[in-house]
Amino acid sequence: MNTQVQAKKSVQPMTGPEKIIAKACGLPSVAPGDFVFPIPNMVMVHDNVLPSIKKALDSIGIDQLTSPEKVVLVTDHEVLYGSPRAALYGATNRQAAKAWNVGHFFDVGRGGHGHIFPMEMGLVSPGNFVFDNDRHCTNVGAIGAVGFRVGLEISRVLATGTNWIMVPHSLLLTLKGRLPPYVHARDLGTHIGRLIKLGEIPFDLDYKILEFAGDLDQFSLAARVALCSTPTELGAYGVFFPPSSAVLEHANRVAKSPFMAEYSDPSAHYQMRAEIDLENLEPLVSLPGGIQNAVPISEVAGLSIDHAFIGSCGSSMFEDIAAAAEVLRSRKVSSGVRLFVVPGSEETLKRLAATDLMQVLIDAGAVVLPPGCGPCNDAVVGPLHSGEVSISTATNNNHGRFGAKDAKLYLGNPLTVAASAVAGSIIDPRHL
C-alpha cells in the first residue's frame, strides 16, 4: 500500500529538515534561530530514564499523557537484568506503560533497540518529527525523518505534547564516488570526524543538522543508520538523508500511517557546505578516547585484543551482522578473545535464525545476546577489566565505557571487528 502523500511547495526555500519542523509546527515556513513548538509524530523514551520521568510526573500530579498513542516506551538498555536495580526499573516501566495507556510498549523480547526497530516496523516514516530523551535519535535521519533529543525535558513532551526548540542551522556534506570493497559506512562516519578534527572539513557540528547529498543511492537503510549515528558523538543535533527510492519503497511497505517525505529546495540556505571523495577511503580504526581519533587500520594492525563486540545502534542491522558473519564463516574466534554479537532488533534476530548465519556465528564461537544495547550501555553485560583491549562497533569509545577506565577501546567497522576476533589482534579485513 502506498502511504505517501504529495508534498506541498514551500513558501520560501527550505532544507528538508526545516520543512519537517515547519510541518510539525503547522507553519508555512521556519528559519534557523526561530523558537518553535513542534508536535511530534512519535515520542521515544528508553528504560534507563523512564523511572525518573515517571517519578517526576507523579510528583506534580500528572497521571495522564497528552498523546499516549504517540508514545513508544522501549526496554533496550538493560535487556538482561544484571542487578536488582535493573529488575526494579523493569517493573516500574511496565507499571508506567499500563498506567499511561501508551500506544507502544516494547518490553524485553518485543522490539529491540529503540533507535533501530521503529524504522523497520514503520513507527517512524520519512517526513516525521520525533522527540527522544536520547541523543542517538539522530538515527531516524536515515529514513528521512528528524529526531531531536530533549533529555529529561521529554517529561514535558509527555505531559503537554510538545517542547520548545530553536531551529538549528544546517550543514551540507556532499559525498562523491563510491565506497571501495570492505569499506563500511562506519568508516566514512569516523573519516568525517577525523576530517573535522584536522580542520579539513571546517564544520562546527554543535547544535547543527548535518545533511548528506551526492552519490547516495549506494547507501542502504542500514548504511544510512551507521552514518547517522556518528555525527551525534561530534555534537550534531540532527542528521538527515533525503529518502532514496529504496528507502521510500521500504517505508511504503511498513508505514503504520500516511507520511509525506520532504526534500531540500535547490536554493535552500546552508551555513556551510563541503565535499568528500569516497573512492580512496580505506578501513579506519578510532583510537581510544573518541571516534574522531581515527587512523588507517595499518597504524594499529597487530595489536592484540581480548574483547570484540558487533552491535550498537550504529551497526546492528541485518546487513551489518550478515557481513560480519560472512567473515566468520568457517573460521573460529581466536582463543582468549570473547566476541559478543548483539542484533539491533527482534526482526534482525529472526532473519539471522531463518538463514544459516546464526549457526555461522555460533560455530565461530560468538556469544549472541538479545537485541538491545548490549555492552554499549556502559558494559552492563560483558565488561572489561583493567588493561584489557577491545575493538567494537560501539557508538563511542570514551574511557570507561566498557568497564575499567584503563581498558583500551578501539572502534572499527563490522568486518574489521569480525576479522580481528578471528586473528586475535586488529587486522585489516582485506588481509585475513
Could you describe each region identified by the protein language model?
Residues 1-432:
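Fe-S-dependent hydro-lyases/dehydratases of central metabolism
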